[in-house]
Amino acid sequence: MIKIAHEAPLDIFEEIQTYTDYDYALVHLLEQNPRYRDAFERAIKKGREVILDNSIFELEEAFEPERFAQWIERLRPTWYIVPDALEDSKKTMNQMASWNLRYKDVPAKKIGVVQGKTYEQIKACYTFMDKVADVDMIAI
């Protein structure tokens, strides 16, 4: 089944929820904006499905893992995206392995993102996510 989500300005956040299946939170904005944080806390209390993103595109590198784990504990999203490395399959796989050792008990479903620059790198990263990483979902 295809699900729809849209990032939305806070002023129309609740209206947008009437058109979407889940909400997509950027972790760095949870720290920066109390209104943003409150909106997602309310969404979770209402039973909305929420994905917590590590803000890699916005920050150009993934949010710091320890702080990210703390936000997962605090927010309790449905899903979270493990910190990855843009277009870097080896670093992404290493970060996933490290995450799995240090944060195996965080409360939510885990999404692993496939990264790489070449077909072979992307294929290797996908295989790692599928066979080794113990993720609940793979994102490409």
Predicted features by range, described:
Residues 1-95, 99-104:
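Non-catalytic, usually N-terminal nucleic-acid engagement modules in DNA/RNA processing proteins
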Residues 84-86, 91, 108-140:
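Glycine/Thr-rich beta-alpha phosphate-binding loop at enzyme active sites
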